[in-house]
C-alpha cells in the first residue's frame, strides 16, 4: 500500500490527537447496503492500529424501501423528507436496524463497537407545519460518545434527534454530521461513498482540492453540476469553521486506509488550505523561513550564498511556508526564454495534504514551459513523470520538461542540467 515510513508518519500524527478528535466517518445508507464487508474491515483495521473513529450513518435507501412497503409515499421539500407520525415509527425502526446491523458486523469482525441510537442530538422542530416530525439540531451531547471512546469502542450513531421533552425527530444525516463535527472539531471528516470521490468533467477522480486557491475557479467550471456544487459549498462552509489542519476525505470504504495512511491517498482530499504567495524578488520573502523549509524538505543544507547567487524569476510559497516552488530564468534560446525549476520543497507534515500540488498548480498556470532535474531516488519522481512531457536519464539525474518546442531546446536543457552546480550540501 505504501512505505512503512509513510504509514508510520501518519499513524504518529493521528495518535497524538485526543481520541475524539481523530475522525468522524459519515456512512450513507447505500454503503451500509452494498459495501458492508469493506466498511467493517476498514473500520476494524483502524481500531487494530489504535485509532477509534466516530461513525455516523444514514439509511436513505432502506427507509425508502420500508416506507414504500408500508404504502407511505415519499415526499420531500427542499431536499428534506417530510415525516408524519406514521413515517417516524418506520424511521426509528429502520435506523435502529441499520445501526445494529453495522455494530454486529463490526463485532463479528473482532472490533469493539457501541450502538448509540439516541441521546446525542438535542433538536427542535424545523417547521412542524411544513416538514412534520423533522428536527433541527440545537445541541450535541458528547457523553455517550466519550463513554464509548473511553471503553475503546467505536461509537456508531444514528441521526435521530430528541426534543427536551423527549419527542423523537427525524434529522437529516448530513446536517447531523455537520453539527457533530462542529462540536468535536476533528482532524479528519470522512465521507464514504460508492463513487470513491469527486469526479471531473472526464469522470476522472479529483485527488485533492485546496479551497484557498481553487474554489473560485472550480465553481466556474461548466461540468460542476448542481449536486456537486452544493457538496463542495457545504464542505467549504464546514471547513471554514474548523481548525486549518482539519480536512475532508471522500473515498470508498475499501480505500479508507489508503486515503488515511499514504501521501497519494485514494479519493478526494479537500482542505481549506493556504493562500499561495507569489514573489519576483528575494526581498519579498522571509528568507530564514524559506531556507528552513528547503533544508527540512530535502534533509540537506543550502549552500551559504544561495540567495545571493541565485537569480530569482518567480517563487510560489504557501502562506505558512510549508511548500514552495522556486524558478530561475536560464536565458534566451531560440524564440523564447527558458525557465528552470530550481527547488520544489514540501514539509513532511504537509505531505498528503495536497498543498504541494496546490502550489505547483498555481505555478503551472503562469509557466507554459519548464525544465528541471531530480535525483534518481527522489520519491517525488512519480509526480514529476505525471507532470512532464518527457524525461531523460543522466548518470546522477533525471531531467524532466514540459512545453519545450523542439529537440534543440530539449538537448540544450539536458546539457544545462548535466553541468549545473548543486546548491544543497550533503
From Swiss-Prot:
It is an enzyme of class 2 (transferase). GO terms for molecular function: acetylglutamate kinase activity; ATP binding; L-glutamate N-acetyltransferase activity. Keywords: Amino-acid biosynthesis, Arginine biosynthesis, ATP-binding, Cytoplasm, Kinase, Nucleotide-binding, Transferase. It is found in: Cytoplasm. It holds the Pfam family AA_kinase. Residues 274-425 form the N-acetyltransferase domain. Coiled coil: none annotated. It catalyses: N-acetyl-L-glutamate + ATP = N-acetyl-L-glutamyl 5-phosphate + ADP. The record marks 26, 231 as: Transition state stabilizer. GO terms for cellular component: cytoplasm. Residues 1-252 are annotated as: Acetylglutamate kinase. It comes from the Bacteria. Its main location: cytoplasm. InterPro entries: AceGlu_kinase-like_sf (IPR036393), AcgluKinase_fam (IPR004662), Acyl_CoA_acyltransferase (IPR016181), ArgB_GNAT (IPR011242), Asp/Glu/Uridylate_kinase (IPR001048), NAGK-fArgBP (IPR041734), Vertebrate-like_GNAT_dom (IPR006855). Its EC number is 2.7.2.8. Residues 253-426 are annotated as: Unknown. One of its GO terms (biological process) is L-arginine biosynthetic process. Substrate binds at residues 59-60, 81, 170. Pathway: Amino-acid biosynthesis; L-arginine biosynthesis; N(2)-acetyl-L-ornithine from L-glutamate: step 2/4. The keyword Nucleotide-binding applies. The keyword Amino-acid biosynthesis applies. CDD domains: AAK_NAGK-fArgBP, DUF619-NAGS. In the N-terminal section; belongs to the acetylglutamate kinase family. ArgB subfamily. This is Acetylglutamate kinase. The gene is argB.
